[in-house]
């Protein structure tokens, strides 16, 4: 992909709106791939709950915009940018990246051991599960009854994106809840 863009004079832009700000255990989701983009986009976690987006250009691409070339009606909101600075500071001071790696590895390992789960994939705290049977929506409902919120984007697919500061104890509790929910749904 990098070579194709270089050969054709195209910028390689990675969308890190969901995978940025530590979600995958790295600052940006592309980092584990080893591919270097020309620019990345950020939002969601960047503002810590406040509306904020950004584009970061790297290397020669960073010279393509000069002051005044681009404007935004809502750009540069001081409250949202202060929140972003607080988010960045918290990620660094609280060693969130290492924590996300540790809890993510625990979840990937433990969820793969649950009967009825045929695949677990992901990085950090962005995890997808494939179920043996098309019961994902029922599992979501049962998990909610048991105290856990999850998402089912497909009949056999579960998506997990817990808070980056989820404790190991909370992760352990979730594994137990998920296992119980899947077992109950599969035996209906």
Describe the residue ranges of each PLM region:
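Conserved N-terminal phosphate-binding loop of PLP-dependent enzymes in the Aspartate aminotransferase
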Residues: 1-188
């Amino acid at each position: 992909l990098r070579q194709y863009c270089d050969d054709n004079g195209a910028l390689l832009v990675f969308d890190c709106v969901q995978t940025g700000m530590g979600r995958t255990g790295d600052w940006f989701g592309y980092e584990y791939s080893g591919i270097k983009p020309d620019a990345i986009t950020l939002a969601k976690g960047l503002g810590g709950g406040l509306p904020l987006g950004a584009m970061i250009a790297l290397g020669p691409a960073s010279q393509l915009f000069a002051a005044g070339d681009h404007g935004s009606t809502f750009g540069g909101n001081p409250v949202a940018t202060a929140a972003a600075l607080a988010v960045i500071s918290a990620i660094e001071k609280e060693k969130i990246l290492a924590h996300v790696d540790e809890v993510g590895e625990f979840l990937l390992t433990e969820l793969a051991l649950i009967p009825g789960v045929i695949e677990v994939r992901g990085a950090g705290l962005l995890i997808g599960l494939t179920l043996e049977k098309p019961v994902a929506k029922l599992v979501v409902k049962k998990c909610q009854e048991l105290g856990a919120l999850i998402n089912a984007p497909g009949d056999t697919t579960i998506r997990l994106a817990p808070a980056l500061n989820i404790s190991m104890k909370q992760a352990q509790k979730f594994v137990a809840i998920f296992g119980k929910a899947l077992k109950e749904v599969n035996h209906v």
